[in-house]
Every structure is written in C-alpha cells, then in structure tokens.
Curated annotation (Swiss-Prot):
Record's protein name: Sodium/mannose cotransporter SLC5A10
Residue positions, PTM Phosphoserine: S48, S141, S145
Species per Swiss-Prot/TrEMBL record: Mus musculus (Mouse)
Observed effect of gene inactivation: Mice are born at the expected Mendelian rate and have no apparent morphological abnormalities. In response to long-term fructose consumption, they develop exacerbated hepatic steatosis associated with massive urinary fructose excretion and increased hepatic triglyceride levels.
Gene: Slc5a10
GO CC terms, sorted: apical plasma membrane
Reactions this protein catalyses: D-mannose(out) + Na(+)(out) = D-mannose(in) + Na(+)(in); D-fructopyranose(out) + Na(+)(out) = D-fructopyranose(in) + Na(+)(in)
Coiled coil: none
Length: 596
C-alpha cells in the first residue's frame, strides 16, 4: 500500500524539544485534571446524570462542546486540505451551521425536551409508534459513527502525528483512544462537555497563532488572492489544467453546473444534510438536551454559531497559504511527486495543515499545535463514544432487556465504549490502506446518501400532524434503497484522476452529491406523505407535545421545572437570546455577501 511503503519518506528529521514535550505533557495533565474534576462533581449514578449530565448544564460549556464536537481532527485536516485544493467555498459547510444551530434551539429542542426523551430514535418511537423505525435509526447512527466519524478523525489525527512526529501509527492511535475512553467511561456526558470546553480554548488559541504566522509569511490577507493564483507546482501533467488553482477560489457562490461546490447544492442540499447533523444526530443534540432550560440551550447554540465563523480564517485560509508556500508538496499533481510528498498518488492537499505546523511553528509552539490536534481528536471521539453508548443502551439494549435496572444500563453503557474502542482499533488497517485524498469526499458522499431520509421524517413528524408510522417507515425505506444504490455506484465507479476522461454513469457524472441530497429528501417526503394519507391518522397521544402545533405553551419561554428562575427573568433572557440570534444572522449574511 502506498501509505505504508512511503510512510518514512516524509517523517520529520527533527526531534521533539524538551519544551515541546513539556507543552504536550501540560495539555494531557489539564485534560486529566478537568476530567477528574467534572467526573467527581457529575451525577453519574443515574441514567439522566450519566447520559444527559442531569439536564443541568449551563450555556457556555454547551456552546463550546457543540463547536468542539464538530471540529475533530478530520475537519482541521480536511478543511485546510479542501481550502488548499479549491479555495474558500468549503467554508459554507461551517457557516451554514449558523441557521441550523438556531433551528435546533428554537424549533427542535422544545419538542425534544417536552417529549422527555433521552435519544432521538426514542422521540421517533413516541411520535409514530412501533419499534422498527427506532431500531433502524439507532443502527444507522451507530454505523455512521463508527465508519465515518471515528474513521475520519482517527485517520486525520494519525496522519498529523505521523507527519509531524514520525510516531508509530498504531501506538499513538491506541493511546489516544485509551485516554479518551477512560474519562468518557468515568464521568459520562458532563465530563465530555467540560473537557470539550477545555479543548475549544486550546484549539482556538493554537489555531490563531498558526494563522497569524501563516499570513505574515505571505504579507497579509491582501496578498492571498494573487499568491494563491500563482501556487503552481514545478512538475505538471501536460495538456491539462490540473495544476492550476481554481479561478473562482476566492468566491463562496459557484456555478450550479460546473462548480465543485455549486451554490444551489451548498444552499439547499447542504442545509438538508446539516439539519440531520445538527438537529437529529445524537452526538450533537445530546448536548442541547443537557441544558438546564431552553434559554441555556439557545445561548449555547448562539455561542457555537459564533465559533463556527472562525474556521474560514483559522483553517481554510491557512490551507490556501500552505499551497502558496509549498506548491510542489501540497499542490502536487504528478502521481510520482505526490507519492514522494505524502504517500498518496491522487494528491497531497490533506497535508496542508501539518505541513504548516512543521515548517512555521518554532520549538514549544510546535508542541502546542500537536496538543491542538490531540484536543480536536479527543473532543470528537469523546462525543461519539458517549452518544453511541447512549443510543445502544437506551434504544437497543433496553428493548432486549425491558426489565434492566439503572445499574445494568449504566454498566452496558460503559461496556459499549470498550467495544467501540475494539472496533476502532480493528478499523485502523483499513484506514491506512484508504486513499487519504478521498476521506473528506467519502464522508460527504455517505452523508448525502443516507442522511436526507432521516431529515425528512423528522421535519414532517414535527411540522405535519397527519404524518404517521406507515408513511415514515416506507419513506425511510424508499430513501434507503435509492441512497444505497448511489453509494454502491460511487464505490464501483470512483471519480477519475484529473486529466482522465470521466466515464462514470450519467447519474454520478452529472448529479452532484449535494444536488442528489435535495432529490433524495424530496423523494422521501413524497413517499412519506403518500403513505400517511393512504393509512389511518396518528392517535392523539402520538402528537400531543410531539409536534410544533401541539406543543405546550409554557415552552415558548424555555421553562423547566426547578430551574430556579422567575417567569420575568426567563422572559428577559429569552429576549436577550432572540436579539443575539438576529444579530448573529446579520453577521453571517455580511460574511456571505463579502466573500460571494
């Protein structure tokens, strides 16, 4: 395998300094300290305490955890790599989250809290009845967690450590998994959220330092556009334009038919996929469900949205600068050159961020950036482990063992994390053999093929009282068949390298995966609507407090029994959140317009 045979070609010759080792040691010590502190203060001896932090979490750790959970090492490496390869447009994946995060807190969370659920499949069972949809969603979420989220973060983190330090791939990955699992098992969601808050601070500080040094290398932001346009490798493929940076690299909105990230797909298709991730995926929603009241959930979403503005300047633009500074490595197009630079023939854009770290960061700060990547990896993995444990315990094990007590459920929840560790370690050889240039595309393709049907049943379930179990199930099945067919075709007919004729079937060649997400969403909605109208309507208990139109009115101010706030104080903070949300959207629109 290319990744194995050339792995030593790009291992750094320099050794870690004592200062670097001290910085990394301090980082791990802080993690252990925060983990022990939060584990000791957390109520982890009940199901609600372990899986939902006792529903007593404040807004600031929720917001930090929402951000940290979504910014794993896969996004650090992937966003910088996509920026190096194609420019700014990939920032849309981050900025689109603003509107969906607000929808989570203002629309979805009131429904979820009023329904008194622990997992999202549990809500679907209450809303539609029956067990088959809940089981399907739980299994689907577990599969997506293991084979997309964990795999991408592990690969990207291991790639970074290998390039920067030359550490053994297996040893560093297993050590990271062990540390992550230790404090996740010990303290539950509260520990995960508080350590995520620490990771967020470390990630932002380290990324800011590297971004400032990168911009200084090229003379500031004003020089980026001209410098990026000239970032051409010395060796190119004759009679092709593969080596040329995109002409629309500095623009967010790209042509619907010829753009690599068409504006239609980034506006509508991405919103469908983002709604699944931010509003219906257990990993994310679990943080908002832990809020002490709805106002804290709203404030957490607002904080996370502001933080999601940062990756443009902290990851994507530094990735573009990396191509400017190292065009022969980051921008390589000749397979033999790419093999030399990073061990992958298809391209080396994914080494953009670690390359910057190794070339620009001095002794000490290099250790800080290694800690940053470890922070990104740990925060993402802890989130996935805790949420996957919750899904299996509450949606699968409790159905197999209805008489299971709280002690048994807590034990099973901890054992599931151990099993996930084993599966993750077993997946490492597959990751090493995978093409590093395709990981980010692989993740998005899988999401576009499997997520839209889930988004559809949640949207219709919340906003359409007539939707029932028959319609939801057959809508899901129709979406699964069509989405799985697309996935199979993508694996059978991979996208050809630049410079080769595209002979893939027309549905793959002509239909962008973001546009496919739109079509799949509409298909699922149509089948679900038809199935619901052709079968009996849902019972009253399946819509009471379970749809937007049947929600109890006291949830409009974020009331929660026992939160210790007067109605006047709740109303005041609700208005503060509303004003902040409007201001946030104005800031987001300004940035979109500026980089349009």
């Amino acid at each position: 395998m290319a990744g194995n045979s050339t792995g030593d070609a790009h291992v750094p010759g320099s050794q870690l300094s004592v200062t670097d080792i001290i910085v990394i040691s301090v980082y791990f010590a802080l993690n252990v300290a925060v983990g022990i502190w939060s584990a000791c203060r957390a109520n982890k001896n009940t199901v609600s305490g372990y899986f939902l932090a006792g529903r007593d979490m404040a807004w600031w750790p929720i917001g930090a955890s929402l951000f940290a959970s979504s910014e794993g090492s896969g996004l650090f490496v992937g966003l910088a790599g996509s920026g190096a390869a194609g420019g700014l447009a990939v920032a849309g994946f981050e900025w689109n989250a603003t509107y969906v995060l607000l929808a989570l807190a203002w629309v979805f969370v009131p429904i979820y809290i009023s329904s008194e659920i622990v997992t999202l499949p549990e809500y679907i069972q209450k809303r539609f009845g029956g067990q088959r949809i809940r089981t399907y969603l739980s299994v689907l979420s577990l599969m997506l967690s293991v084979f997309t989220k964990i795999s991408i973060d592990l690969y990207a983190g291991a790639l970074f450590v290998h390039i920067c330090l030359g550490w053994n791939f297996y040893l560093s990955t297993i050590l990271t998994l062990a540390i992550t699992a230790l404090y996740t098992i010990a303290g539950g969601l509260a520990t995960v959220i508080y350590t995520d808050a620490l990771q967020t601070i470390i990630m932002v500080v380290g990324a800011v330092i590297l971004a400032v040094k990168a911009f200084n290398q090229i003379g500031g932001y004003e020089q980026l556009e001209a410098a990026y346009a000239q970032a051409i490798p010395s060796r190119t493929i004759p009679n092709t334009t593969c080596h040329l940076p995109r002409a629309d690299a500095m623009h967010m909105f790209r042509d619907p038919s010829t753009g690599d990230l068409p504006w239609t797909g980034m506006t509508f298709g991405l919103t469908i996929m983002a709604t699944w991730y931010w509003c219906t995926d257990q990993v994310i929603v679990q943080r908002s469900l832990s809020a002490r009241n709805l106002n804290h959930a709203k404030a957490g979403s607002i904080l996370a949205s502001y933080l999601k503005m940062l990756p443009m300047g902290l990851m994507i633009m530094p990735g573009m600068i990396s191509r400017v500074l190292f065009p022969d490595d980051v921008g390589c197009v000749v397979p033999s050159e790419c093999l030399r630079a990073c061990g992958a023939e298809i391209g080396c854009s994914n080494i953009a961020y670690p390359k910057l770290v190794m070339e620009l960061m001095p002794i000490g700060l290099r250790g800080l950036m290694i800690a940053v990547m470890m922070a990104a990896l740990l925060s993402s993995l802890t989130s996935i482990f805790n949420s996957s444990s919750t899904l299996f315990t509450m949606d699968i094990w409790r159905q197999l063992r209805p008489s299971a007590g709280e002690r048994e459920l807590l034990l099973v929840g901890r054992l599931v994390i151990v099993v996930l560790i084993g599966v993750s370690v077993a997946w490492i050889p597959v990751l090493q053999g995978s093409n590093s240039g395709q990981l980010f595309i692989y993740m998005q393709s899988v999401t576009s093929s499997l997520a839209p049907p889930v988004t559809a049943i949640f949207i219709l379930g919340i906003f359409w009282r007539r939707a029932n179990e028959q319609g939801a199930f057959w809508g899901l099945m129709a979406g699964l068949v069509v989405g799985a067919l697309r996935l199979v075709l993508e694996f059978l007919y991979p996208e050809p390298p630049c410079g080769q004729i595209d002979t893939r079937p027309a549905p793959l060649r002509s239909l962008h995966y973001l546009h496919f997400a739109i079509a799949l969403f509409l298909l699922t909605c149509a089948v679900m609507a038809a199935g619901s109208l052709l079968s009996p309507p849902p019972q009253q208990r399946q819509i009471e407090n379970l749809t937007w139109w049947t929600l109890a009115p006291n949830w409009s101010l974020g009331t929660k029994t026992g939160d210790g706030q007067t109605p006047q104080k709740r109303a005041f903070w609700a208005r503060v959140c509303n004003v902040n949300a409007i201001f946030l959207m104005c800031v987001n629109i300004f940035f979109y317009a500026y980089f349009a």
